[in-house]
UniProtKB/Swiss-Prot annotation:
Protein name in UniProt: Large ribosomal subunit protein uL16
PROSITE patterns registered for this protein in UniProt: RIBOSOMAL_L16_1, RIBOSOMAL_L16_2
Biological role: Binds 23S rRNA and is also seen to make contacts with the A and possibly P site tRNAs.
Gene for this chain: rplP
InterPro entries: Ribosomal_uL16, Ribosomal_uL16_bact-type, Ribosomal_uL16_CS, Ribosomal_uL16_dom, Ribosomal_uL16_sf
Entries under Pfam families matching the protein: Ribosomal_L16 (PF00252)
Membership in a protein family: Belongs to the universal ribosomal protein uL16 family.
UniProt keywords, alphabetically: Ribonucleoprotein, Ribosomal protein, RNA-binding, rRNA-binding, tRNA-binding
Amino acid sequence: MLQPKRMKFRKMFKGRNRGLANGTEVSFGTFGLKAVGRGRLTARQIESARRAMTRHVKRQGQIWIRVFPDKPITSKPLEVRMGKGKGNVEYWVCQIQPGKVLYEMDGVPESLAREAFALASAKLPLKTTFVTKTVM
């Protein structure tokens, strides 16, 4: 599972997920999966989608993951009274804004890439779209 090796502070404020995304262009591969909506992806969801794509293309070509879960989400145990500090880190998420390229792929035909990204998209809680690299 993806998570930072070390952080200066263990816990983080909840914050807001506003604004526009960086990394909106396909830069490494030829095809990409771009987020249409905003939300957050957990490390498990990122890994699950990656596995679905890798299995579908039968490990040919190359896949890049363009997102990284760097925000810790805490929760308190069940049946614990309010107060007594912030809970423990349960999982890691990556905040996604519209237009962010989540995954990229190269070395496979477009039809196979579309199918693989459709499988990956089913694993994600965001609306996504298929994009190709624009050649200037």
